[in-house]
Amino acid sequence: LGSENPEISQLHSRRLREQTNLTETNNDRTRLRRAIASFSALQEIKLLRLQDEADEYLVDFIRDHSLGTSTSTASIRFDWETACSRAVTNLSIALLASKCSSIRFTGPQISPEATLQLLHAPSTTLAAMGGRLTSLDINFHSATDITTTMADLSGVFHRFFIAAKNLIAIHIGFLSKTPLDLDLELLFHHIRWKTLRKLSIQGWRLSADEIITLARRHNAQLRDFRLLGVYLRPGGLWRDVLVVLREEMEQLERLVLKDIDYAAHFDSVFDSNGVEVFDDYPAGPVPSSLTVAAGTSSAQSPTTTPLVSDGFPALLRERQLPLRRTSLERLRALSSEDLGDDGVHVLREQRPLWEAWVLSAPHRVKRNGQSHWSM
């Protein structure tokens, strides 16, 4: 590397010396404690993975010079687990040493291995951390199935969530292509948060009853509910979930059903070689006459799908949806049997209709004199 690109070589040599010194002297922990303590009104902490052009150049260099050797190029990667473990530990120490409260924590690429360190954390430490959070937004990043690892962490989640009584927003996510196959309550432990307004779960195999039970626990206060890459286990139907959300969620203003499906169909789209088979319906732009704008955000719903000119996509019409034009009254008149749920596969075009159907319930709470969705 030194002869091919001296500048990059010198940069990585300097970084190595700096990182070695920081970790051996715990100077990173000292500086982090000092930094967090200096913010008397700190509101949010984000733990982000950094990989810049110099890092990518090094990976490419190693890969290129490993050709024809016994080194597996597929195994070349930066060790994020070690860095994430240290970051989680030091952030916890720094936060507990500060006077900060009402913190929103975001970790879009949390290593499950890093979280295992919390198994050894005293219950008082987990309680102190949990009590300071108002928002927990974490995605566990692993290309392999981590169901066993998360099962081992069940007790940690229980101690933490019991103490986290002030949570307003929760997002627990896993990669949708390697969904967690674990009972929901092994992480949520039947806990009801009185302050919870937003709940999001991603990348999970769940039964319809699990989703319904979770929603009912928070039916009086939940305003934003998001199911992302959630796959129903055999024995349940999405329309049963939708009926409960429509009829029993008193305050619901926003619903997102991004990439939901049935677990059996999800498994079937991978052939014996592990190659994904994508949906065969067109994804190109089509004129739209239906917009789901749930909540107060001006951004378009991530699951809003272009529809044909009469308000319903062709694939829904093939399932004999009874309407030919979009109106609030006609949408409200639909029954769960009219939604086209065949218990096998959820079409991309169905999701925005289902979201709108749930939010169109006549009893839906209105704020500022109007519903938080429009057509």
Segments from the language model and where they lie:
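Leucine-rich solenoid repeat modules
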Residues: 35, 194-375
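N-terminal adaptor/linker regions at the entrance to substrate-recognition repeat cores
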Residues: 1-120, 126-135
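A short acidic (Asp/Glu
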Residues: 55-60, 114-120, 147-149, 181-184, ...
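Active-site-proximal segments of catalytic enzyme domains
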Residues: 135-155, 166-191, 198-202
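Leucine-rich repeat
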Residues: 31-39, 61, 89-99, 120-132, ...
